[in-house]
A protein has these predicted regions:
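Juxtamembrane linker/hinge segments adjacent to a transmembrane helix in small membrane proteins
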Residues: 1-33, 146-156
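Short beta-strand elements
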Residues: 12-21, 62-68, 107-110
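Beta-strand-connecting loop/turn residues
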Residues: 23-25, 62, 116
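Generic recognition of flexible, low-complexity loop/linker segments
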Residues: 14-15, 53, 124
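Structured segments of extracytoplasmic/periplasmic soluble domains
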Residues: 6-10, 53-56, 60-63, 94-97, ...
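Periplasmic OmpA-like peptidoglycan-binding domain that tethers envelope proteins to the cell wall
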Residues: 28, 34-48, 57, 69-156
Length: 156
């Protein structure tokens, strides 16, 4: 709730969404305004917002997972080999901006490119595709629960 309140203006403007999923808080950055189409270059005017997010989450315990996402459209680019490449590079751009914040522990960062594997919408219309193009900053709170080891015996 503190994060939501601090980012209220950006949420109202449609640049961000904040969602609490229980053990994970997700801050969703829309592509529009953050990156040019088909590019991982984080727009200069958007960098202060990414630093503000890093400043807000630096005191929240847990792993900070930065995930890049794309739509399912083929990429026509000499810079990026695929949507995997583009989504990864966008996540890296955001993570590197977060690292610039004094006191932010980069050891907490995990960066991943998801391409079009976790869409929020189907990709039928341009507006639905635009919602899928995003970077998510997830703060994972709590430790994962691992099951007991299962022994495997070889059959003779």
């Amino acid at each position: 709730e503190t994060i939501k309140k601090a980012l209220e203006r950006e949420i109202d403007q449609g640049a961000l969404e904040v969602e609490n999923l229980g053990q994970e808080i997700v801050i969703r950055i829309r592509e529009k305004g953050a990156f040019p189409a088909g590019s991982a270059f984080l727009q200069p005017k958007f960098r202060p917002l990414v630093r503000q997010i890093a400043d807000l989450v630096k005191e929240v315990p847990g792993i900070v997972r930065v995930s890049g996402h794309t739509d399912n459209q083929a990429l026509d680019s000499e810079l990026y080999r695929s949507n995997w490449d583009l989504s990864s590079q966008r996540a890296v751009s955001v993570a590197q901006e977060m690292e610039k914040v004094r006191g932010f522990d980069h050891q907490r960062l995990r960066v991943r490119g998801m391409a079009d594997t976790e869409p929020l919408n189907n990709n039928e219309t341009p507006s639905m595709r635009s919602r899928n193009r995003r970077v998510e900053i997830g703060i994972l709170q709590g430790k994962p629960k691992y099951s007991d080891e299962v022994s495997v015996q070889q059959a003779n």
